[in-house]
Amino acid sequence: MSDLGAYIHAVETASSASALREAVIQLAQQNSTAAIPTLIAVLGYNNPAAAQAAVEGLIALGDAVVEPLLAQLDGYNYGARAYGVRVLGSIGHPAALQVLLAAAQSDFAPSVRRAATKALGTLRWQLIPEETVREAQLKEALAVLQRNSKAADWAVRYAVGVALDYLHQQAAARGIREAVRSLLNHLSDRDPDIVVRSRCQLALQRDSLSMHT
């Protein structure tokens, strides 16, 4: 058994929640793309601490994770799906866009909708080289954020504010900047929840500071 195989075996045979978490941490620390399938599998285990360790390990591996994770997103386990969407959002590769748009709009699990909504702002939009394609996809994302700004769940609306803040800071998203600012202004004034209003006000303050530096 190879060294990496031993780490994978330790994950697969862990006899307690704490042992599993430690085994996942050790596997993630190997920083090997060969560990990706095992780390993805851990997202579906009923062990939040181990899943969080797997999330961190997958994020550290970067773009190599995107294709296998998209192929293996769990349609039945919403907890695993939420972790997976968080990974995709943190990595930020636009190959995940269509999955994120669908999840943000229609996933039945609030945790998945929140994670996908935030991820629309953290995508690395500059990786879409064709400007007309990028602008069209940015408008798709903005339409979903506008829709989710009316969600009953305050946490989804909060995620909209976070996504708008990230989008507003991206040079690649300058084509929708005025629309982003307009939606931030609307939410900062009219959202019924003070936490959402405050988050949007923070984004606008950041914008104001950047304009004067």
Curated annotation (Swiss-Prot):
* Pfam families with a match to the protein in the record: HEAT_2, HEAT_PBS
Q: Which UniProt keywords apply?
A: Antenna complex, Lyase, Phycobilisome
Q: Does the keyword Lyase apply?
A: yes
Q: Which GO terms describe its cellular component?
A: phycobilisome
GO MF, one example: lyase activity
The UniProt entry, under PANTHER family, shows: HEAT REPEAT-CONTAINING PROTEIN 4, PBS LYASE HEAT-LIKE PROTEIN
Describe the function of this protein: Required for the chromophorylation of the CpcA gene product.
The family classification in the record reads:
Belongs to the CpcE/RpcE/PecE family.
Q: What is this protein's name?
A: Phycocyanobilin lyase subunit beta
Q: Which organism is it from?
A: Thermosynechococcus vestitus (strain NIES-2133 / IAM M-273 / BP-1)
